Amino acid sequence: MSKSRLTVFSFVRRFLLRLMVVLAVFWGGGIALFSVAPVPFSAVMVERQVSAWLHGNFRYVAHSDWVSMDQISPWMGLAVIAAEDQKFPEHWGFDVASIEKALAHNERNENRIRGASTISQQTAKNLFLWDGRSWVRKGLEAGLTLGIETVWSKKRILTVYLNIAEFGDGVFGVEAAAQRYFHKPASKLTRSEAALLAAVLPNPLRFKVSAPSGYVRSRQAWILRQMYQLGGEPFMQQHQLD
């Protein structure tokens, strides 16, 4: 290898190492800060806002209103757990059984990819990472998930998730969603309304709360049944999530 190539390789290696250190400090600081402080915006919100501006849409505003867990209807937390991650109170960020099922399904159905991300993984991804599929992003997501599971309580993870989840075009967080679609605060959401909001996750740009398709209504009904089977509101109290 020539001297010039060695110099370039050495420069790139030093740059990547420094970048990794900067990102580790940034993400570590974010995990520590947001264990107690409200989250003002997420990486997904920034990505959506920048994309809108680049496409000339200057009216788009990625909007979120932070609310604490006691300002959110317990039905909402139960609905997303029933819909997205029923083992949320038990696992340490990853649902191994669901991952194995998803891998088996994806091998048989290459055109219909199924995910197995837990609420913890989705929180890490939405808060700190870019959208898309890649092994690099999944690796970073795994590390960040372990970080928030180590530092945050389950209640804190659920609180952040509900405040940064995307529920429609420019609608982030359950408070903004409740106001937009039901004209009420998140604390007043009914069981059925909570299930409808959860039914569009994790693809709220395809499935609409404001114009629910037959699939969304079917999923809403399924979520309501799962909420009942989990035990209703006592489930949230039992696991100290309310």
From Swiss-Prot:
Question: Can you list the GO cellular component terms from the UniProt entry?
Answer: peptidoglycan-based cell wall; plasma membrane
TM ranges are 19-39
Catalytic activity, reaction form: [GlcNAc-(1->4)-Mur2Ac(oyl-L-Ala-gamma-D-Glu-L-Lys-D-Ala-D-Ala)](n)-di-trans,octa-cis-undecaprenyl diphosphate + beta-D-GlcNAc-(1->4)-Mur2Ac(oyl-L-Ala-gamma-D-Glu-L-Lys-D-Ala-D-Ala)-di-trans,octa-cis-undecaprenyl diphosphate = [GlcNAc-(1->4)-Mur2Ac(oyl-L-Ala-gamma-D-Glu-L-Lys-D-Ala-D-Ala)](n+1)-di-trans,octa-cis-undecaprenyl diphosphate + di-trans,octa-cis-undecaprenyl diphosphate + H(+)
Q: Name one GO molecular function term.
A: peptidoglycan glycosyltransferase activity
**Pfam families named among the record's database cross-references:** Transgly (PF00912)
Q: Which GO terms describe its biological process?
A: cell wall organization; peptidoglycan biosynthetic process; regulation of cell shape
Membrane topology category:
Single-pass membrane protein
Q: Which residues form a coiled coil?
A: none
Localization (cell) = Cell inner membrane
Q: What does this protein do?
A: Peptidoglycan polymerase that catalyzes glycan chain elongation from lipid-linked precursors.
Q: Which NCBIfam families match?
A: mono_pep_trsgly
Q: What is this protein called?
A: Biosynthetic peptidoglycan transglycosylase
- The record lists the organism as Shigella dysenteriae serotype 1 (strain Sd197)
Give me the gene this protein comes from. Answer: mtgA
